[in-house]
């Protein structure tokens, strides 16, 4: 699973706000191919955030499938995530895709894996990718010991992961959802 070693995606939920951010580095083995990739998307009219780690083509395929599930299920994040995970696990072509997703709406944050897992993390903090453990640790420390806004926690967590993980850079894209955002 070499493809998973290439990014950091982290999400933090605090109060009525959720932020999802990722770095911009794409690597092929140990070579940086691109430094400004967009691994975070707003879906379903801006009401859902999605971020991916893993093979780029695989992740785009999964994002498209997830968006189709959102349309089919009127934006219901939980049902859409479970349906995608079921397809991912049982469909012969999808089973070969190597990627992970974090998706979030105003109420839930979920990690979706190719093993058929749909996980809702405790404390509203989720991270995936090669720098995910570093970002999650930083996010948890900041979340528990400060009152910083979720987007600030995500930014600082990505900075820390970028300082430690060679597959994570400092070109960040962070999207938010909250009561002040027009969706």
Curated annotation (Swiss-Prot):
It is an enzyme of class 3 (hydrolase). Keywords: Allosteric enzyme, Cytoplasm, Hydrolase, Metal-binding, Protease, Sodium, Threonine protease. GO terms for biological process: proteolysis involved in protein catabolic process. The keyword Phosphoprotein does not apply. It catalyses: ATP-dependent cleavage of peptide bonds with broad specificity. Its main location: cytoplasm. It is found in: Cytoplasm. The keyword Nuclease does not apply. Allosterically activated by HslU binding. Its EC number is 3.4.25.2. Coiled coil: none annotated. InterPro entries: ATP-dep_Prtase_HsIV_su, Ntn_hydrolases_N, Proteasome_sua/b, Proteasome_suB-type. One of its GO terms (molecular function) is metal ion binding. Na(+) binds at residues 162, 165, 168. It comes from the Bacteria. GO terms for cellular component: HslUV protease complex; proteasome core complex. The active site is at residue 7. Belongs to the peptidase T1B family. HslV subfamily. A double ring-shaped homohexamer of HslV is capped on each side by a ring-shaped HslU homohexamer. The assembly of the HslU/HslV complex is dependent on binding of ATP. PANTHER family: ATP-DEPENDENT PROTEASE SUBUNIT HSLV, METALLOPROTEASE TLDD. Protease subunit of a proteasome-like degradation complex believed to be a general protein degrading machinery. This is ATP-dependent protease subunit HslV. The gene is hslV.
